[in-house]
Amino acid sequence: MSSDCGNCDCADKSQCTKKGFQIDGIVETSYEMGHGGDVSLENDCKCGPNCQCGTCTCHT
């Protein structure tokens, strides 16, 4: 995921999940390791009408 999404927020906060994965009440943060890439979060929900990143999506 591009850092361009980092300053974008969901227009509808009800679409946002907690940062990281929520499995049975446990929130786990997913990092991209060993690839030399940026830290990657699946459900960081950094999207909205002002987002410059075309791949940002809110998870419902």
UniProtKB/Swiss-Prot annotation:
UniProt KW keywords: Metal-binding, Metal-thiolate cluster
GO biological process: cellular detoxification
GO molecular function: metal ion binding
Highest rank taxon of the organism: Eukaryota
Free-text function comment from the UniProt entry: Metallothioneins have a high content of cysteine residues that bind various heavy metals.
Family in the record: Belongs to the metallothionein superfamily. Type 15 family.
Protein's name in the database: Metallothionein-like protein EMB30
Protein species of origin: Picea glauca (White spruce)
Gene it is expressed from: EMB30
